[in-house]
Amino acid sequence: PIPITLTLVPIVIGAVLYGPGAGAGLGLLFGVVTAVAGITGYDAGTQGLFVLSPFWTVATCLVKGTACGWAAGMVYRAFRRKNTLACLVAALCAPVVNTGIFALAMMTVMRGALVAFAGGTDVVYYLFIIVIGVNFLVELTINAVLSTAIARIVQVVGKK
């Protein structure tokens, strides 16, 4: 399993407060940190991917982080007149995009690594149940719960 990240929450806050560009920048920073953690061995799962597919591992880290921050900002912008709803949808969007791009990369450009890790288990089952399953649900739940706090931060900052 991949580690659960709480880093998406500050990315969403930045995207909501300062727009999609800021969300993308924070997401890119998250991607860089994730890639470095994998390269250095701090994150064993990412390191395993890096050993088997260095270019695509780094590219996936950078793209998924950047895209989740940008998407959260765009979604918030689309719904911003309804602050609480906008924050909820933006907060849910980030883990969906982050995990979705990871899954897409694993099923396409890093499929060889996925097959190696699955060790004979059906790759779709392995990816979505073993690797992503609980992680995604926890991240989605945390972001949903914290979206009200994000909305409150936006209200307070917006009044200044």
Task: Give names to the regions the model predicted.
Residues 1-160:
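Loop-helix junctions at membrane interfaces
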